[in-house]
Amino acid sequence: MTDTSDLDGKKATARAWFESLRDQICAEFERLEDEAPTDLYAGEPGRFVRKPWDREAGGGGVMSMMHGRLFEKVGVHVSTVFGTFTPEMAKNMPGADEDPRFFATGISLIAHMRSPRVPAVHMNTRFIATTKSWFGGGGDLTPLLGYQRQQDFPDAIDFHAAYQRACDAHDPTWHAKYKAWCDEYFFLPHRNEPRGIGGIFYDHHDSGDWAKDFAFTQDVGRAFLEIYPTLVRRRMGETWSAEEREQQLVQRGRYVEFNLLYDRGTMFGLKTGGNVESILSSMPPEVKWP
């Protein structure tokens, strides 16, 4: 059952955390830009450019985009929006059938790397309130080369372990459940293949203890901040071939297909009057369909 006490305070607390996490991630990614070896990554280290936007129906957000030498394209976005769901949206949102007003705040990130040896990554966490409230989010890794897309590859093992630690700190049953949900969610039925090697995915997370649920969502964000830079540092010094770059560009096509056909966040943003530039910034900067 949703704890509705001091809902305004909870909204502000969640929003402040997502903005703080954004700042931490952007700072770490800029450090990685500085550390990238110059013999593999020419040019000046990239820096994030922030662009605020307003939603006509209520709220807005800030896009943080970087086109760097290591990070070919990365967006780390925060948004806080509120208003009234359309009847179609209200039918699918817990608590909105009683009252269609809503509030949503969160962070969303997608990184496409220049090196095909460094996996792409997606992470988002969010807090949504109607007459009920809940958290959702997760993180998933998308290696672009076939040999890295195996569950026994070291990067996959370490990525899953990071999220297992985050889950186990709160409930030892959560990781298996949210890992399976991630595998089910990030799957392309028309290709009959997963988008990547998975991670965790959760939604409508409401135990009735807001502080506990918020702490878990914070730990999901911290787990990402711990593991992904570790994997980038592990792989960014490896050289790559033209054939591997080609494989990367083709595999990126799967990313585009998933985000435009199936992704809940994309659909939610477009159907609630979100910022189109921000929503579609998840698209890779270069992609091929052979």
UniProtKB/Swiss-Prot annotation:
GO CC, one annotated term: cytoplasm
Gene3D superfamilies registered for this protein in UniProt: Coproporphyrinogen III oxidase, aerobic (3.40.1500.10)
Cofactors named for this entry: a divalent metal cation
Catalyses which reaction(s): coproporphyrinogen III + O2 + 2 H(+) = protoporphyrinogen IX + 2 CO2 + 2 H2O
GO terms, biological process: protoporphyrinogen IX biosynthetic process
Similarity field: Belongs to the aerobic coproporphyrinogen-III oxidase family.
Name of the protein described by the UniProt record: Oxygen-dependent coproporphyrinogen-III oxidase
Species for this entry: Caulobacter sp. (strain K31)
